[in-house]
Amino acid sequence: MDDILFVKADGDYIHIHKADGDTLMTLMTLKALERQLPFDHFCRTHRSYLVNVDKVEGLKDGKNRIGGKRIPLSDSCKATFFEILSHKSVVLKAQS
């Protein structure tokens, strides 16, 4: 679980992106996986993305950066995302 950077939905499949660069694809919905993961470590940032908040590196232009990739942060998910980050005392730097 700690090696998961983020998960991207693709219909009824999900792509699990790991810290070692591997990507796993499995037949499961993002919602089903979200229910199985600890809510204080994983947060929905967009209808198609679930991120490991411990791996967030920064924010720029409404997107967060994880593992060198820019992940969308939708308006409807911002409040929950920042709430979880505030409880974890995560300090984000602006990306240029």
What are these regions (language model features)?
Residues P72-D75, A79-T80:
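C-terminal structural segments of small proteins and small subunits
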Residues L33, T80-F81:
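DNA major-groove recognition helices of helix-turn-helix
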Residues M1-L73:
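Conserved binding/recognition cores within well-folded domains
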Residues E83-S96:
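Short, charged, intrinsically disordered terminal tails
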